[in-house]
Amino acid sequence: MTILTQSTTWQALAAHSQQIPHMRELFASDPARFSNMSLSTCGLFLDYSKNRATPETLNLLLTLAQEAKLDAKIKAMFAGDIINTTEKRAVLHTALRSTAEQTIIAEGQDIVPEVQQTLNKMQQFVTSVTSGQWKGFTGKTITDIVSIGIGGSFLGPKIVSQALRPYWMTGLNCHFVANVDGTSISEKLKLLDPETTLFIMSSKSFGTQETLTNTLTAKAWFLAKGGSQSDVAKHFVAVTSNVAKATDFGIDADNIFPMWDWVGGRYSLWSAIGLPIALLIGMDNFRSLLKGAHQMDTHFANAPLAENMPVIMGLFSLWYGNFFNAQSHVVLTYDHYLRGLPAYFQQLDMESNGKSVTLNGTHVDYSTGPVIWGGEGTNGQHAYHQLLHQGTALIPADFIMPLQSHNPIGEHHDQLASNCFGQTQALMQGRTLDEALAELSKSNLSDEEKLLIAKHKVMPGNKPSNTLLMDKLTPETLGALIALYEHRTFVQGAIWDINSFDQWGVELGKSLGNDVLARIGAEQDATALDASSNGLINLYRQGKI
């Protein structure tokens, strides 16, 4: 057993998990449960009353956090300590949304001035493009942006841009390309005019296979459509650490934006990786996004653990994963603009906490990162919600909804809200056999048929959920929401004693992919790998089954 599972608190939680009453009983016995188990900060309201928890549960979970030195680990992250131990890096995405007055030390120097300089450079660039001052190679203004990246440099900008669609104000169109499948970029290029298109290439090394391949394809298209090598600088900019490679490509050094080792890809949308966002919503709104995230950072760093929203959410996720064998967690967004958030949180959580050894290399004997999935309400109610209500797996849920709609049409939002709240109630209370029989009492079915149908209509309830509300979806509230989930992810990793900031599984996939690519291009059939890999490579080389 590991130190964590040997602890008295862990053992107490395991015993306590078997003694929790049904949530129906918990609500019946405590009329103040909603007010006692809700929290408001940074423009967000969290109702965590529909969890399998009593005051004793929270006390035990908070004790577990204290024993894991969560407070000290939070301070270490904000202080710029080397908490990504396998890569010997600080973890300072929080510095990207810091204020100019702060001092944050990384690698022996204050990094805040460079962050502020980059924001100012972004401001100048966004103004140049959106004002029409930036011209393409034929003198036309830019109308379309193509953002080329992968992972965090793709998903963050895309999902945030989608979420903030009501704040698009610059008249630009933005297209996102990530997958190395040629169909992805080909379909985008069919829509574009090379004279009015600007490409943003985002890659720390300027060598990420998918991103570089797509960028080279974009460049070849641009040159084939009338552009010249000397025109590349007017249509390509880069966010990268490798200035030399970017300038060799033809990008003007003045149009290269920095990336830093102390920011992981899945935490990078707050940096110049967020250029596509800023080009769509303007820098004032982009700064509001940063402001909301900074407010959540301040809350996370300073609020007592018992009143700390990311801590509460992280502890409950751990509670279900480690003591109720919950293998997945569903995120349900009751707002069309937020429909992409489950995929974003999926990458954030699963790439961060999909680990199986502790910081000192000991194999864990407890579950770590769950599968994160989800979708848009109310669509999911007519699909996978069935499994949430009557399936055999316990799947904790997060419901996210703004109280006010950007598009208040008739009763649409009232119906949306009623469905959201109704689902949380149904998951919590379920339906008993007696209740199901009562519903069938006036039917013409025989008693035997009624009993049979009633058994099929029984729902156990006691299915946990959090509900997150905001007044309205704005850049500021979105920033706070995303930062909330970043810190929630950190809380779990800190207690599990794993490194939430490396991704060696991703790196292995890249390495083996490059090796296979070389074998695909070889003259002879593949023979050196396992039989399956050899067979697949050779079938691909034949081009038919």
Curated annotation (Swiss-Prot):
One of its GO terms (cellular component) is cytosol. SUPFAM superfamilies: SIS domain. One of its GO terms (biological process) is glucose 6-phosphate metabolic process. Its EC number is 5.3.1.9. It catalyses: alpha-D-glucose 6-phosphate = beta-D-fructose 6-phosphate. It is found in: Cytoplasm. PROSITE patterns: P_GLUCOSE_ISOMERASE_1, P_GLUCOSE_ISOMERASE_2, P_GLUCOSE_ISOMERASE_3. This is Glucose-6-phosphate isomerase. Catalyzes the reversible isomerization of glucose-6-phosphate to fructose-6-phosphate. Pfam families: PGI (PF00342). It is an enzyme of class 5 (isomerase). Pathway: Carbohydrate biosynthesis; gluconeogenesis; Carbohydrate degradation; glycolysis; D-glyceraldehyde 3-phosphate and glycerone phosphate from D-glucose: step 2/4. CDD domains: SIS_PGI_1, SIS_PGI_2.
